[in-house]
């Protein structure tokens, strides 16, 4: 973490994301909150919604909002409310999207209201979301590049190896025999 902290401290001074609006549709947890806060500290305007209505942590969402991050999510949203939250993020006119499941990417591609957005790229976290994006590409309707995080070599090197191990240890520590 020290290397990451030093890098962020150095970059905060130059604000490399100043003038960039980022839209996030992710599980709103303490882990993802770090990403959102760092993006804001690096100068970005940040808007987020929960990537899954069942995983949003309300205390984290409230904290993000208190930090000046445009936050549209709460636990237990209905499908209609979930869609409304995605629309609110897109209404901020993000230039880069970070998505988990491609709900926001699909809406940006097929809802005519968002055709004028100047999105120059996105990331997708899940295999299911990447499959949805590939279907958009096969239709010839992909308007901007989308990076598949799941296919990244570093994800296989670190997240799959160490993240899975850490999750196993965390799960075992919760078992009370």
Residue ranges and their predicted role:
Residues 175-177:
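Conserved small/polar residues in nucleotide/adenosyl-binding loops
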Residues 1-156, 162:
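N-terminal ligand-binding/catalytic initiation module
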Residues 171-172:
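Phosphate/ATP-binding catalytic cores across multiple sugar-kinase/actin-like superfamilies
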